[in-house]
UniProtKB/Swiss-Prot annotation:
One of its GO terms (cellular component) is cytoplasm. This is 2-dehydro-3-deoxyphosphooctonate aldolase. Pathway: Carbohydrate biosynthesis; 3-deoxy-D-manno-octulosonate biosynthesis; 3-deoxy-D-manno-octulosonate from D-ribulose 5-phosphate: step 2/3; Bacterial outer membrane biogenesis; lipopolysaccharide biosynthesis. Its EC number is 2.5.1.55. It comes from Chlamydia pneumoniae (Chlamydophila pneumoniae). One of its GO terms (biological process) is keto-3-deoxy-D-manno-octulosonic acid biosynthetic process. The keyword Transferase applies. Its main location: cytoplasm. One of its GO terms (molecular function) is 3-deoxy-8-phosphooctulonate synthase activity.
Length: 269
């Protein structure tokens, strides 16, 4: 499905408007162009952040306008698109534009959502819930497979560790890989501090380099990275996104690590 290339899913947390979305996509395209023979990248952004900490937090432009903007990104830059779907009713509309439909971590056991998303025929990115062990993902995987769709990605995004904290257990990478589906490591959501800032989540982006390197060394097939021109003023996940400059600086290391690890057989866990 991905021709043994590293998978890189990148973009801002939420669609903040057409101009800024196109700007970020264009800069990512330029950054990633030299790696096109080794990295398959997808632009990601959300049309609706339905699980914000506060009722008053920015959620995005909504389904219709959001998909219009994502379609323009796809047409302008020729890049594959990922967005997350929160209700079964949105799945088919989203699949008309997006190559990958993402089931959010909090919703990864919702049968109707999983089935509706899979029935579109799009690639389904299943994010492992913060409350689940990697072994528990067998159930969500089987719900997707029940539709006849076997185009699945599995994403590790950390596990709840007490209050307002997440930890990343790298044992999850080989465990999820046993499914036979590519495993993605979400290096920016994994450094979140959920609810730590009262009405929004905090984050420890200084650990993104370490965790992303560890995941690739453990055999991850790719990375999920949220990035922005200016994370400090981003309307969602400001504390856990990388700047485009930070993203570009880490890219050579990610490329080298993936190439290195792919060159030898991983010992089975």
């Amino acid at each position: 499905m991905f021709n043994n290339k590293m998978i890189l899913i990148a973009g801002p947390c939420v669609i903040e408007g057409e101009d800024i979305t196109l700007e970020i996509a264009g800069k990512l395209q330029s950054i990633l162009a030299p790696y096109s023979d080794r990295i398959q990248w997808f632009f990601k952004s959300s049309y609706d952040k339905a699980n914000r900490s506060s009722l008053n937090s920015f959620r995005g432009p909504g389904l219709t306008e959001g998909l219009r903007i994502l379609a323009k990104v796809k047409e302008t830059f020729g890049v594959g698109i990922l967005t997350d779907v929160h209700t079964p009713q949105d799945a088919y509309a989203a699949a008309e534009v997006c190559n990958i439909l993402q089931v959010p971590a909090f919703l990864c056991r919702q049968t109707d959502l999983l089935v509706a998303t899979a029935e579109t025929g799009a690639i389904v990115n299943l994010k492992k819930g913060q409350f689940l062990s990697p072994w528990d993902m067998e159930g969500p995987i089987n719900k997707v497979l029940s539709t006849g769709n076997n185009k699945i990605l599995l994403t590790e995004r950390g596990c709840s560790f007490g209050y307002n904290n997440l930890v990343s257990d790298m044992r999850s990478i080989p465990v999820l890989s046993r499914s036979g589906f590519p495993v993605i490591f979400d290096a920016t959501h994994s450094v979140q501090l959920p609810g730590a800032l009262s009405t929004e989540s905090g984050g420890l982006t200084e650990f993104v380099p370490t965790l992303s390197r560890a995941a690739l060394a453990a055999g991850a097939h790719g990375l999920f990275i949220e990035t922005h021109t200016n994370p400090k003023i981003a309307k969602s996940d400001a504390a856990s996104m990388l700047s485009l400059e930070e993203f570009a600086a880490l890219l050579p290391t990610w490329d080298q690590l993936f190439t290195c690890v792919s060159s030898f057989d991983m010992v089975s866990a």
